[in-house]
A protein has these predicted regions:
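Generic N-terminal amphipathic, Lys/Arg-enriched alpha-helix
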Residues: 1-29
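Short, structured helix-loop boundary elements
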Residues: 11, 32-35, 98
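A short alpha-helix capping/helix-coil boundary motif
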Residues: 18-22, 29, 47, 83, ...
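A short, well-structured juxtamembrane/interface segment
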Residues: 27-48
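Glycine-rich phosphate-binding loops that contact phosphosugars or nucleotide phosphates
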Residues: 43, 53-196
Length: 196
């Protein structure tokens, strides 16, 4: 198929975009080991009737919703997120936006739950406050999904960290979702299955 007329710059942009993502998803033993370690933690926690709490802002919140539903329904691992407008607005009003998530974890978290935090920038204050205080509330381990600066604040609180070497929100968020859904399929043991 030939290139549509007068679209060479768009083709070049898309070629670079796809190649950037292709490099991120190239097989990498370090990432594989972290995914395996994380999945084993998740399974172990599930067997103890503990849950995973996942949170993010904006696109990362949407990813957390998708992951929590698929993980609970398809992999049979309990997972919750805090994307209810009433919870966010109530807790933000009462505790301030920077502390609403920390307080949601305080109220809903249970001893030895796992906490997954997604922040493309790694600098979201509500995510940082949640990470900083989660273990005080009994959270066992924190798994972070970040991008931009390798030494970002959110990553510094993680026991396992998935950092994306990019400064593009969409590239970072797409890769975070790819990693999280890979965890679901890794726990199930296959990527094709009936959705019942």
């Amino acid at each position: 198929m030939s290139v549509l007329p007068n679209n060479e710059k768009k083709i070049e942009f898309l070629n670079n975009y796809f190649n950037t993502f292709r490099k991120l998803v190239s097989p990498d033993i370090e990432t594989f080991n972290k995914l395996i370690k994380t999945s084993e933690l998740m399974i172990k926690n599930s067997k103890k009737n503990k849950k995973i709490i996942i949170a993010g802002n904006g696109g990362s919140a949407a990813i957390s919703s998708h992951f929590s539903v698929d993980l609970t329904k398809n992999a049979k691992v309990k997972c919750i997120n805090f994307n209810e407008a009433d919870l966010i607005t109530c807790f933000s009003n009462d505790f301030g936006y920077d502390k609403w998530l920390m307080n949601a974890i305080k109220f809903y978290g249970e001893r030895n739950d796992l906490l997954f935090l997604i922040s493309a920038s790694g600098k979201s204050k509500n995510i940082i406050n949640a990470a900083k205080n989660a273990k005080k509330f009994g959270i066992k381990k924190i798994v972070t999904f970040t991008g931009f600066n390798k030494n970002n604040p959110v990553k510094s609180y993680g026991d396992i960290n998935f950092w994306v070497d990019s400064k593009s929100y969409n590239i970072i968020e797409n890769y975070h979702q790819f990693l999280l859904l890979a965890l679901v399929d890794l726990i199930i043991g296959k990527s094709e299955y009936k959705s019942n």
